[in-house]
Amino acid sequence: MNNFAKIFQSNWIDLNKLGKLEIFLKTISGIYKAPNRTHLLAHAADISSFYAVKNIYEYMKNDDEGKVILKNKPLLIRQDIQFNELKKLPKNTLGYKYMEFLEAYKLHAHDREAAHFFDDINYSYILTRYRQIHDIGHVVYNLNISIESEAALKMIELIHTKLPITLLAILVAPFMTPLYRFQYIFKDKIPPNFLNPNFDYTYKDDYNYIDELSLKQYVYNLTEYFHIDKIDNNIFFQKLYKYYFDNLNNSNNIRGTIIYGYNNEDNNDIIFDDINNEYIFLKNPEKNYFLFKYKPRQTLLKQLYPWAYMAGMAATKPLHSIHIENWLDKDIDLFRKTYNIIPLPDHLNLMSGIN
C-alpha cells in the first residue's frame, strides 16, 4: 500500500474535463501513427476508462480476493517482488515463465505506466494493476507481442474489463496487422552470412526457381505445402498426408502450417501444382533453416479473435482480480486449471505463441 501511495502521489495530474478531452484526442491520433509509443495508449485509457474502472472497483470490493488486493495494493515491481528469485523457480511455475517472457522480449513490469488522471487512489491502482498484469496475460495465454497477439489479448481484456481502449485496439488492429509475413526459423544460431547477398534464400523445385523474399515473384496459391522438419515416423507421415488431403478445401488449416519435433533427414515437402492439377512430393536438400510464411491479418480475424473471445468468456475470473503474487511459485498449468484459462491452441503457437 505504501509503495502505491507514493506512486499515486507522484503520478497524479490534476486536469479539468476539457484538458482531458484535448489529451485524449491528441493521443488517439498519435497511437495510429506510432503504435509502439505505449504511453499514448496509457493516457487514452486513463481518460476514457472512468466508468469501466468504477465497475471493476465495485466487482473487486465485493469479491473476497479482490478486497484483499484493494487493501494491500500489491505491485509487480522490484520493491514488492524479488525478480531474480523468480528465475530460480522450477521451469513450469508461473513466476519462472513470467521472467522468461520478460527477458525474451526485453520487458519489465516497471515499463507499465501508472495511471495519471484518476483522483481516487483505488481507481488509479486498478488501472495501474491492469497494465502490470497485462504481461501475466501474455504468459498464461501463451501470446507473443506481435500486433495480432496483442489484439487477441485485448479481446480477452475487453471481456474482463470493458475498458474502451481495448475495444479501440480490437477495431484498429486489423488495419495495422501485416497482410503477409516471412519468418526464418533456424535450427541453430543465425549464420553470420544471413544478411549477405550470397546467402541461399531460395529453394529449387521441379518447375521454377522462386525468390522467397520477393512477393512479386512469389505466387502464394501455387505453394500450399507443409514444411516437415525432424520426422522419422512413417505412420506420422501417413497421418500428416491424410490431414493435408482432408483439409485442402479449407486452406486456413493448411497455409503457413509447420509440423516439427521429430527427426527427418530428407526435409520433405508436399505441394499442390495448380498447372498440372496434381500433388507433388518433393525431396529437398537438408537445410539448417526453413522459411515460415503466413497471413497475420487473416489469422487474426479468422482464428485469433474467435479463440480469444471463447477464452475470455471461459475464464472464471479476470486476471486483475486474482492475487497473482501468491501464484508466482505455483505450477502455471494448475493456475490455468483453477481459473479455466484456455491458452493459445497449438496450431497457432509458431505464429502467435511465445517462442
Curated annotation (Swiss-Prot):
It is found in: Mitochondrion inner membrane. It comes from the Eukaryota. The keyword Nucleus does not apply. The keyword Membrane applies. It catalyses: a 4-hydroxy-3-methoxy-5-(all-trans-polyprenyl)benzoate + H(+) = a 2-methoxy-6-(all-trans-polyprenyl)phenol + CO2. GO terms for cellular component: extrinsic component of mitochondrial inner membrane. Coiled coil: none annotated. Zn(2+) binds at H134, D135, H138, E150. InterPro entries: Coq4, Coq4_euk. One of its GO terms (biological process) is ubiquinone biosynthetic process. Its EC number is 4.1.1.130. Pathway: Cofactor biosynthesis; ubiquinone biosynthesis. It is a peripheral membrane protein. Keywords: Lyase, Membrane, Metal-binding, Mitochondrion, Mitochondrion inner membrane, Ubiquinone biosynthesis, Zinc. Its cofactor is Zn(2+). Lyase that catalyzes the C1-decarboxylation of 4-hydroxy-3-methoxy-5-(all-trans-polyprenyl)benzoic acid into 2-methoxy-6-(all-trans-polyprenyl)phenol during ubiquinone biosynthesis. This protein may be expected to contain an N-terminal transit peptide but none has been predicted. Belongs to the COQ4 family. Component of a multi-subunit COQ enzyme complex. This is Ubiquinone biosynthesis protein COQ4 homolog, mitochondrial.
